[in-house]
Amino acid sequence: MIIIITMVIIIIYEIIDIMQLIRGDNYQSWVYSSESDLVAVDPWLTRKQLFPILGWLLYRDSEKSSYLEQHDQIDAVTHIIITAHFSDHLDLESLKKFKADIPIFTTAEAAKVLIKNHFTNTVIVKPHHKYQLGSFELEVYEAGSPYHSTTFAYTLRDVTSIIFHESHMVDSNLSFKNLNACILTVDQVKVLGFIKVSMGIEQAKKMQQKLNAEYLLATGIAPNKTKGLITWLLSIKENYSSLKGVNSACNETGDSLML
């Protein structure tokens, strides 16, 4: 009986296009799979992320291999989304592991860096515009303050599911009728004690409710693991390891959610 049920589930998955959402690493990378498409967001595939030129200003060590490395999926990636030009989102050494002509959807500032480093298929995204990534549709939204001019939020949908991702602060004007999942920050980070650059858990839970999302997935986790001189300017309150009362998923590298 168990074998029959398993076979039925497999057949259903083959008939229906199921979106799979995967935590790409132990920080803020994500992977989406649907049909023959594999989309990587802010991929980090190196042992250490470094601030450009002056690495001692900001750096972070990887604790384990990324999902794409573990499963030998780097060459299977069909599209890349880079949400910001900051070095913890745009890791050049990681991106150099992909083909130079892979489609990359990103900001104007990030595109300058990519073009300078010989990537030939860069698309600069704009708020309220839609882009086709194979079987996925990418729709771009403005990020919340203070990131509204430097990064972006987005939804990614296929024929059955839709997710929302904001890597810093959500624009409080955004709302949706129905999301399968939202990927948000839950570890509050402030610069100089008053400029909030990452949401805390209570704000994230309120946004999950406002966005009408079934699941809340934590991103940008464990900010205390980021080191360097700049971190002395930050005040951090971590919550990612204790998401009580939250319908959450994908807590460890490689964990996935079928939507």
Regions found by a protein language model. Give the residues of each.
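Active-site environment of divalent metal-dependent phosphoester hydrolases
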Residues: 26-28, 46-48, 85-90, 111-113, ...
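Zn-dependent metallo-beta-lactamase
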Residues: 9-64, 210-213, 231, 252-255
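Active-site HxH/HxHxD metal-binding segment of metal-dependent hydrolases
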Residues: 50, 65-131
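Active-site neighborhood of phospho(di)ester-bond hydrolases with catalytic His/Asp-centered motifs
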Residues: 40-42, 77-88, 105-107, 163-169, ...
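Cap/insert and terminal regions of metallo-dependent hydrolase folds
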Residues: 109, 171-258
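Pre-active-site segment of Zn-dependent metallo-hydrolases
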Residues: 37-81, 93-94, 170-177
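Metallo-beta-lactamase
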Residues: 106-160, 248-259
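Catalytic core of the metallo-beta-lactamase
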Residues: 23-37, 132-181, 199-203
